[in-house]
Amino acid sequence: MKFFTKKSFAFLMVILMMFALVACGGEKKEETSATGTTNANGELVVGVTSFADTLEPTEQYFSWVITRYGVGENLVRFDENGELEPSLAEEWKVSDDKLTWEFKIRDGVKFSNGNPLTAEAVKSSLDRTFRKSKRADGFFKPTSIVADGQTLKISTEKPVAILPQCLADPLFLIIDTSDNVEEYTTNAPICTGPYVFKEFVPTEYAIVERNENYWGGKPGLAKVTFKCINDQSTRALSLKSGEIGVAYNLKIENKADFEGQDDINIQELKSLRSTYAFMNQHGALGDLALRQALLRALDKKAYTENLLGGAATPGKAPIPPTLDFGFDKLVDENAYNPESSKEILAKAGYKDVDGDGFVEKPDGSKLELNFVIYTSREELKVYAQAAQANLKDVGINVNLKTVSYETLLDMRDSRNFDLLIWNVLAANTGDPEKYLYENWDSSSASNQAGYKNEKVDELLDKLNVEFNPEKRKDLAIEIQQLIMNDAATVFFGYETTFLYSNKKVQNLKMFPMDYYWLTKDVTVTE
């Protein structure tokens, strides 16, 4: 048995700052950088979009907030290159029959309340996650989780090739369950990260403070405030004025807001994020011909190059071209072709009976598709409005419905949509397997669009147990081609992400898996 280690696999009462960036609490100063002297007790304000309405890590994707804000940690994590590395587990190995993974829990780690991190504590946390989360079984299903000293063993009925990578997803962050809290709301779970929650007001702000018990060295900031500013332009202006020091989810067009302002850093990364829309096959879009016609009406190249200024790659397949899973080999039978779209509609019996410019269904009833989008990402509205216009040109009537992210999740789960936009990491485990399973396996709790292809299910089962990288790649390519042939989903584009910050903020990094916003290394200078 070989051990795998590092690379194997609110508003606030006082938000406006008197200085160009952040409040500096305390007098102690340390290292000198190119931009000034590091403040050992510095404070930072970060502009974000509203995302979570509770701090319950098993609900929806709210664990991402806990991790992004520097509070939650996992057994393993991803580095800047998307490679797996140790975190709360120092090393891990798989048994010869590939049914049991063994993790050695790091010694000397404490939760923020001072309780020691033990294998038993990790087991209790993971047990809670599998008991409470609808998503957990989509990663893997343990037959047993056993703690022995500082060793944790996880067994499964079938081999799970990427089980360690699965445990890097924020859903599996480790909390201290000894507080016996069944459901966290604005009260925060006790974790091991460099920061702890001080205050959380949903849709307004969150405050985190330095974890004095942090095992990885002294965190670089005394306090960080995450301020919800959903409007993109307002977020940019807040950074420009110095009200905030970091702005997430700004776009390429915001560069113009900072022309001539040399105190701003702009980082960019071709991300693993994919923007797509589910097509609900429980309704009108259960008709393959209608889905094919819809896809062929969409000029996705124009959306990404003209409307988004080249800050995205046109969509075609489930997995972005930034991952080596056959993007260029895949054939898009439903590429942009509006004349073909009209022909498919006519042949399938969709005709404009009443002369209003929109086709009716073959039975003569009205065809109206409701397209649900959420508010916290500006580019989603751009895609949706452009798609609405393209579809009008071929006679398909689409109504846009803009809601909060939380409402969108409820509408997805209740199947209250025809089209529903989505923007996620296509490799949340560093590998696309779980992304493919979660969205297109017929048994997945997240597959509320009703897509079902028995061959896709079969290939996903094979992918789950296949350890050979080249065979995994071949399986993923075949799965993608089937999904595309079924006209299952609208793949709009794969974004380039941007991170805007004041130059006084040091050691702020972008990661392919965008789980890690606030790390212990982030500091501010005077």
PLM regions and their residue ranges:
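C-terminal motif of bacterial Sec signal peptides marking the signal peptidase cleavage site
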Residues: 20-23
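N-terminal lobe/hinge region of extracytoplasmic solute-binding protein
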Residues: 47-94, 127, 190-191, 513
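Gly/Pro-rich hinge or "lid" segments in bacterial periplasmic/extracellular proteins
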Residues: 79-83, 168-219, 223, 231-233, ...
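Aromatic- and charge-enriched surface segment that lines or borders ligand/interaction sites
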Residues: 90-132, 153, 285
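Surface-exposed binding/hinge segments that line
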Residues: 93, 97, 137-178, 293
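Ligand-site clamp/hinge motif
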Residues: 211-256, 397-399
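Append "and occasionally in soluble cytosolic enzymes with long acidic Gly/Pro-rich linkers
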Residues: 287-389
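Detector for C-terminal structural segments
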Residues: 298-328, 379-388, 412-526
